[in-house]
Every structure is written in C-alpha cells, then in structure tokens.
C-alpha cells in the first residue's frame, strides 16, 4: 500500500477511536449518565439543599426538633469534627469537572487543528482522484492513441483509489462531527463557568458568611450548653482499687491538650506525698508514678489540681495553699477567714473535711462553715491566683449533716449521706442566691464516700469510695432561647 493510503488509514483509525471515546466517556465526565437534577416544591430548585455537603462530618446536623408546651424550640445539634468550614463537595466536583472539560476542550482543539490539516490533505487527494477519474475516462475514449501498457497502469491506479472515495466522504463527515463536538464542549464549558459563578458566589461568599455566622451562634450555644441543671447521675465506673478508705484523686480541668495526668492523694491528714501518673491508662494498669512532696501536710480530702497547681488546706489550720507542681514551690497562701477547721465543721463522715476546695466551669471555690453562719455551709468563690475571696454566699444547710458536696455551673449540690443509700437532695444556686430540695439518687457502690468532686472538662464526678477510685457521668438540662444565640 502506498504512503498516502497509509496516512489516510491512520487518520481514519484515530477518528474512529476519538468518536468512540467521545460517545462513551464524555457523558460520564459531565455526569449525564449518572446525575439527575430534581426540583423541590413545585419546580423550584432548592439551592440550600443543592449546595450543602452530604457528608455529616462536614455539616451541622439537626437530627430532631420540636416545640414544648411553652413554644420553645428543642433540637439536637451535632457539630462537625473540624471547626473550620469545609468547602462544599458538589462545588468541588463541579470545579474538578470544569477542569476535566477544559482539558478535554484543549485536546479537542488540538485534534481539530490536526483534522483540519488532514482534511485539506484529503480534499486535495479527492481532487486528484477526481482528476484521475476524468483522465481515465479520456483515456478510455481515446485508448487507441495510448499504449496498452500505460492504459493498464492508469486503470490499476484508478481501481486502487476508487474504494477510497466513500471512505473519504465518511472522513469528511467525521471531521464535521469533531467540529460539532468542539462546539458542544465550548457550550458546556460556558454553562459550567456560569454555573460555577452562580454556585460559587453563593457557596464561597454568601454561604461562607452564613455558615460562619451559624458557627459563631452555635459556638455561643455550646458555651451556654456547657452549663445546666443537674438531672441525673450515671452508674459508677470503678477505675481502680487502691489506698485506704479515705483519699482523693483528680485530673486538671485546665490541662493542655495531650496532658492526661492523674493525681492521687491517699489519706485525709498528716500526709505530704502526691502521686502523679502520666495518664489514666497508667493509673489504671500500673504502679508507675512520680511522687511530689508538699511543704506541709494536707487536711481532709478536698484538694484540687487546677491549671498546673494543687490547692489544699494546710493541716490543722484554715490556710489555703497554692503549690506549683512543676517548680514544686508555694505560689500563694491565704487564710480563709472564720472558716472552721480541725474537725470543727466537717462532713458527716468526719476526716478533717472542714474545708472542701472545688472547681467548676467558672473557676475555684471553697465550701466550709463558720460560727457566724451557725455551722451552716458557706460558699466562697476564690481568685485562683491570689486566693482572695471574690464573693461569698451563706446557706442554711448544716455542714455536719452533709455527706459530700460538689459544684456544677455555680450551683452547690449536697448529698444526704455518705454510706448506704445516697442521693443529692439539696441545691443552692449562687447566681440567684436561692435553694431547692431535689431528689437525684446515685449508686453508693462501696458504702463509704469520702470524696466527691466535679471535673468540668470531663463532665464527670470523681469519687473515692472505701478505697475505690470511681467515676460518675452527669446529665445536665439546658434551656437555650433563640434570642440568646
């Protein structure tokens, strides 16, 4: 076969492959074979549904909503794992699709240039073939004037080229098809650009602003949800069995991310050594710990670790000490004026538990009793740096009748005992200076609670119960009005 015929064959083969690829691959690229747009509510496209991500990990999810008898909206909202707004999945797909179409458009542009060049070559050959056909007819009419050998050569050449005439016609049709594809891709690119501008403007400008505003409102809502009214206490989880009947253990609610240390203090008086475990897992499974020696022995089980310091009541005194656990130095000491000590106003179980230090979402607290308040519980909020008393509330609940106490969101909760059947039955709200009697039972698994403290970071109660270190989860009730968001 001659070189021109080989070239035409290659071009035709390439065109067949391109035509087949365009008919099969292009619909899948633009989503025509898998995507169906539907209108919402009477033929109007629901754009808010169309552009929001379908992945629940990338969006705020409202799983249920209702109104109570007073018309307040009650809903369950699950926040995304990442705080930053991720771009819409459909818009990303649109951007990727547009890039593919643009790449395809460039490829078709190159193919079109080659096709036009080859088409010129084919048209030239077509003219040559027509000229040969005309010349052959002339030769047939005047064959007597030519030698038989020349006649046979021309006839053979014409017979070889004649079958290519319909093929060349088909090639010209394919060239028109390529041009049509080029125009359609250009139209599709234009539509996608307009769609991207429309969706992009909504998603990355208006939608981003709306989502950012929603995030701020929900973040404020979550901060409000950090506080609530205690409505339930879970069954206990025994973390470890260790030490004597009395003691305290805790984690730092202000510890930085990754700092999961556990602090352990056995006994309730005349002891100076604090154990530090690297993590809750180490605390549960090993006896590997670092020991810190305090400059003075502690009194009771009301110690707390807060922002890297341990706060404790100095033995046989009403002095509060702030001790830095990193530098192992005393940062501050201050007397808690009029507070009873040395088993004057202890909890019902005794144990020099006159002064009980606590932390909640708002900071550091001290619970104690004074003669001036007839031995009833006094609540004071302390400055965690200076230990200065910021504000004080006098309650009417006798300190010696309380089994244990803890503070959640500025509300003091008091148990009715420390052994046997136990419940939380008194609550004093410092924000309103009011109290109420409640009935929240919880399981006293080992029949002797000598320490019960709330950790606002874990939303859990830490307890020491007859030589067992225990955790309770708490349930808080929240009411957030829409005008508060």
Curated annotation (Swiss-Prot):
<dbReference type="GO" id="GO:0005783">
    <property type="term" value="C:endoplasmic reticulum"/>
</dbReference>
<dbReference type="GO" id="GO:0030516">
    <property type="term" value="P:regulation of axon extension"/>
</dbReference>
<dbReference type="GO" id="GO:0010628">
    <property type="term" value="P:positive regulation of gene expression"/>
</dbReference>
<feature type="disulfide bond">
    <location>
        <begin position="227"/>
        <end position="409"/>
    </location>
</feature>
<feature type="glycosylation site" description="N-linked (GlcNAc...) asparagine">
    <location>
        <position position="307"/>
    </location>
</feature>
<dbReference type="GO" id="GO:0010629">
    <property type="term" value="P:negative regulation of gene expression"/>
</dbReference>
<keyword id="KW-0964">Secreted</keyword>
<dbReference type="GO" id="GO:0043025">
    <property type="term" value="C:neuronal cell body"/>
</dbReference>
<dbReference type="GO" id="GO:0007399">
    <property type="term" value="P:nervous system development"/>
</dbReference>
<dbReference type="GO" id="GO:0010718">
    <property type="term" value="P:positive regulation of epithelial to mesenchymal transition"/>
</dbReference>
<dbReference type="GO" id="GO:0005615">
    <property type="term" value="C:extracellular space"/>
</dbReference>
<dbReference type="Pfam" id="PF12308">
    <property type="entry name" value="Noelin-1"/>
</dbReference>
<dbReference type="GO" id="GO:0030424">
    <property type="term" value="C:axon"/>
</dbReference>
<feature type="glycosylation site" description="N-linked (GlcNAc...) asparagine">
    <location>
        <position position="394"/>
    </location>
</feature>
<feature type="glycosylation site" description="N-linked (GlcNAc...) asparagine">
    <location>
        <position position="288"/>
    </location>
</feature>
<dbReference type="GO" id="GO:0043065">
    <property type="term" value="P:positive regulation of apoptotic process"/>
</dbReference>
<dbReference type="GO" id="GO:0003190">
    <property type="term" value="P:atrioventricular valve formation"/>
</dbReference>
<dbReference type="GO" id="GO:0044295">
    <property type="term" value="C:axonal growth cone"/>
</dbReference>
<keyword id="KW-0256">Endoplasmic reticulum</keyword>
<feature type="glycosylation site" description="N-linked (GlcNAc...) asparagine">
    <location>
        <position position="187"/>
    </location>
</feature>
<feature type="glycosylation site" description="N-linked (GlcNAc...) asparagine">
    <location>
        <position position="473"/>
    </location>
</feature>
<dbReference type="InterPro" id="IPR003112">
    <property type="entry name" value="Olfac-like_dom"/>
</dbReference>
<keyword id="KW-0217">Developmental protein</keyword>
<keyword id="KW-0966">Cell projection</keyword>
<comment type="function">
    <text>Contributes to the regulation of axonal growth in the embryonic and adult central nervous system by inhibiting interactions between RTN4R and LINGO1. Inhibits RTN4R-mediated axon growth cone collapse. May play an important role in regulating the production of neural crest cells by the neural tube. May be required for normal responses to olfactory stimuli.</text>
</comment>
<feature type="signal peptide">
    <location>
        <begin position="1"/>
        <end position="16"/>
    </location>
</feature>
<keyword id="KW-1015">Disulfide bond</keyword>
<dbReference type="InterPro" id="IPR022082">
    <property type="entry name" value="Noelin_dom"/>
</dbReference>
<dbReference type="Pfam" id="PF02191">
    <property type="entry name" value="OLF"/>
</dbReference>
<dbReference type="InterPro" id="IPR050605">
    <property type="entry name" value="Olfactomedin-like_domain"/>
</dbReference>
<dbReference type="GO" id="GO:0060317">
    <property type="term" value="P:cardiac epithelial to mesenchymal transition"/>
</dbReference>
<comment type="subunit">
    <text>Homotetramer; disulfide-linked. Dimer of dimers, giving rise to a V-shaped homotretramer. Isoform 1 and isoform 3 interact with RTN4R. Identified in a complex with RTN4R and LINGO1. Peripherally associated with AMPAR complex. AMPAR complex consists of an inner core made of 4 pore-forming GluA/GRIA proteins (GRIA1, GRIA2, GRIA3 and GRIA4) and 4 major auxiliary subunits arranged in a twofold symmetry. One of the two pairs of distinct binding sites is occupied either by CNIH2, CNIH3 or CACNG2, CACNG3. The other harbors CACNG2, CACNG3, CACNG4, CACNG8 or GSG1L.</text>
</comment>
<keyword id="KW-0770">Synapse</keyword>
<feature type="glycosylation site" description="N-linked (GlcNAc...) asparagine">
    <location>
        <position position="431"/>
    </location>
</feature>
<feature type="glycosylation site" description="N-linked (GlcNAc...) asparagine">
    <location>
        <position position="33"/>
    </location>
</feature>
<keyword id="KW-0175">Coiled coil</keyword>
<dbReference type="GO" id="GO:0007165">
    <property type="term" value="P:signal transduction"/>
</dbReference>
<feature type="glycosylation site" description="N-linked (GlcNAc...) asparagine">
    <location>
        <position position="103"/>
    </location>
</feature>
<dbReference type="GO" id="GO:0098696">
    <property type="term" value="P:regulation of neurotransmitter receptor localization to postsynaptic specialization membrane"/>
</dbReference>
<feature type="coiled-coil region">
    <location>
        <begin position="87"/>
        <end position="225"/>
    </location>
</feature>
<dbReference type="GO" id="GO:0045202">
    <property type="term" value="C:synapse"/>
</dbReference>
<feature type="domain" description="Olfactomedin-like">
    <location>
        <begin position="226"/>
        <end position="478"/>
    </location>
</feature>
């Amino acid at each position: 076969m001659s070189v021109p015929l080989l070239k035409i064959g290659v071009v035709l083969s390439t065109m067949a492959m391109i035509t087949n690829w365009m008919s099969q691959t292009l619909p899948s690229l633009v989503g025509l074979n898998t995507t169906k747009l539907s209108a919402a509510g009477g033929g109007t496209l629901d754009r808010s549904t169309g552009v929001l991500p379908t992945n629940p990990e990338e969006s705020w999810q409202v799983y249920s909503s209702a109104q109570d008898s007073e018309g307040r909206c009650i809903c369950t909202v699950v926040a995304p794992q990442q705080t930053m707004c991720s771009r819409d999945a459909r818009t990303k797909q649109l951007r990727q699709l547009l890039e593919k179409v643009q790449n395809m458009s460039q490829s078709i542009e190159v193919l079109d240039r080659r096709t036009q060049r080859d088409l010129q070559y084919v048209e030239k050959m077509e003219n040559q073939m027509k000229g040969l056909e005309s010349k052959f007819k002339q030769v047939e009419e005047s064959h007597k004037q030519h030698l038989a050998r020349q006649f046979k050569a021309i006839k053979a050449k014409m017979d070889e080229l004649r079958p290519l005439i319909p093929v060349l016609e088909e090639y010209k049709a394919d060239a028109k098809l390529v041009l049509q594809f080029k125009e359609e891709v250009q139209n599709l690119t234009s539509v996608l650009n307009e769609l991207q501008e429309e969706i992009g403007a909504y998603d990355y400008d208006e939608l981003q602003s709306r989502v950012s505003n929603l995030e701020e409102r929900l973040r404020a809502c979550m901060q409000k949800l950090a506080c609530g009214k205690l409505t339930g206490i879970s069954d206990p989880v025994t973390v470890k069995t260790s030490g004597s009947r009395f003691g305290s253990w805790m984690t730092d609610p202000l510890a930085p991310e990754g700092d999961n240390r556990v602090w352990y203090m056995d006994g309730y008086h005349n002891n100076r050594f604090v154990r530090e475990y690297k993590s809750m897992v180490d605390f549960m499974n090993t006896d590997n710990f670092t020991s810190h020696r305090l400059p003075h022995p502690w009194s009771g089980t009301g110690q707390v670790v807060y922002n890297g310091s341990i706060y404790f009541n100095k033995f046989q005194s009403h002095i509060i000490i702030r001790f830095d656990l990193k530098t192992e130095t005393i940062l501050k000491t201050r007397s808690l004026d009029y507070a009873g000590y040395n088993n004057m106003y202890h909890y019902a179980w005794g144990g020099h538990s006159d002064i009980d230090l606590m932390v909640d979402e708002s900071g550091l607290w001290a619970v104690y009793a004074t003669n001036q308040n007839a031995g009833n519980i006094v609540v004071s909020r302390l400055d965690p740096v200076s230990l200065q008393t910021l504000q004080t509330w006098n309650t009417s609940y006798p300190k010696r009748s309380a089994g244990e106490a803890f503070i959640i969101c500025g509300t003091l909760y008091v148990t009715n005992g420390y052994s046997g059947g136990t419940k939380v039955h008194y609550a004093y709200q410092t924000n309103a200076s009011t109290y109420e009697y409640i009935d929240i039972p919880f399981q006293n698994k080992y029949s002797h609670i000598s320490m019960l403290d709330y950790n606002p970071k874990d939303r859990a109660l830490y307890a020491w119960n007859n030589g067992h270190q225990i955790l309770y989860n708490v349930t808080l009730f929240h009411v957030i009005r829409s005008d508060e968001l």
